[in-house]
Amino acid sequence: MSDVARILKEARDQGRLTALDFAKEIFDDFIELHGDRNFRDDGAVIGGIGRLNGQAVTVVGIQKGKNLQDNLNRNFGQPHPEGYRKALRLMKQAEKFGRSVVTFINTAGAYPGVGAEERGQGEAIARNLMEMSDLKVPIIAIIIGEGGSGGALALAVADKVWMLENTIYSILSPEGFATILWKDGSRSEEAAELMKITSGELLNMGIVDKVIPERGYFTSEIIEAIKTAIVDELAELSQLSTEDLLEARYQRFRKY
């Protein structure tokens, strides 16, 4: 098995810590909030408010399940438009009250079903991209498993984008890439090599800003490493004026 194939397998492993795990372990007194106030709550997206070193922070994440029933409830981590609208509601609330935003991303992509399209999946993702680019509080996005397509990017227009070591971030799945390019989804490992989807490759290209080492999925070291990094980064970002914060975010994505 190639290194890319190993990372792809580990990124998709059901045993990985989830967005909710990170929210509860890193932030004190985390309170989950629900609903987009338009249609319904989406179990694939979690969000709420917690405290980090006494500072209130808004946390949003894409949640995969840990077993079959949980995955059915979470739609296998594929958000509907109401999930992205819930995320945006919480981020705009954070802006109103001056809270920083931290997002945790693990999704193969936004849900492509008929109902999701009818309710404006494309519009919901596009609106998140637009609103996050101008959100007047610090944003940190962390890829904790799969970072698939616009479904991941809809929570990743951030001042800093980080990845755990054994995760991926890509425009679509390697299987989808192979199917489009060669009409053969079984060539996904070959596609993954071409796509440059691993954390090390993306760090070298300047697409992500930090790679957090992993020593297994379940260790407290990962929690502590992420917590320390978030505390340090938010302290730096909070020193910037709103104008400088937004300009730096704009330039970060403009360079692509």
UniProtKB/Swiss-Prot annotation:
EC nos: 2.1.3.15
UniProt cross-references to InterPro entries, sorted A to Z: Acetyl_CoA_COase_a_su, ClpP/crotonase-like_dom_sf, COA_CT_C
Molecular function GO terms recorded: acetyl-CoA carboxylase activity; ATP binding; carboxyl- or carbamoyltransferase activity
Name of the top EC class for this enzyme: transferase
Catalytic activity, as annotated: N(6)-carboxybiotinyl-L-lysyl-[protein] + acetyl-CoA = N(6)-biotinyl-L-lysyl-[protein] + malonyl-CoA
Pathway of action: Lipid metabolism; malonyl-CoA biosynthesis; malonyl-CoA from acetyl-CoA: step 1/1
GO terms for cellular component: acetyl-CoA carboxylase complex
Top-level taxon of origin: Bacteria
HAMAP family: AcetylCoA_CT_alpha
Purpose: Component of the acetyl coenzyme A carboxylase (ACC) complex. First, biotin carboxylase catalyzes the carboxylation of biotin on its carrier protein (BCCP) and then the CO(2) group is transferred by the carboxyltransferase to acetyl-CoA to form malonyl-CoA.
PROSITE patterns: COA_CT_CTER (PS50989)
Principal location: cytoplasm
Domain (CoA carboxyltransferase C-terminal) ranges: 1-236
Keyword NAD part of the UniProt annotation: no
Stated family: Belongs to the AccA family.
Subcellular location: Cytoplasm
Pfam families per the UniProt record, alphabetical: ACCA (PF03255)
Assembly notes: Acetyl-CoA carboxylase is a heterohexamer composed of biotin carboxyl carrier protein (AccB), biotin carboxylase (AccC) and two subunits each of ACCase subunit alpha (AccA) and ACCase subunit beta (AccD).
UniProt name for this protein: Acetyl-coenzyme A carboxylase carboxyl transferase subunit alpha
GO biological process: fatty acid biosynthetic process; malonyl-CoA biosynthetic process
Alphabetic keyword roster: ATP-binding, Cytoplasm, Fatty acid biosynthesis, Fatty acid metabolism, Lipid biosynthesis, Lipid metabolism, Nucleotide-binding, Transferase
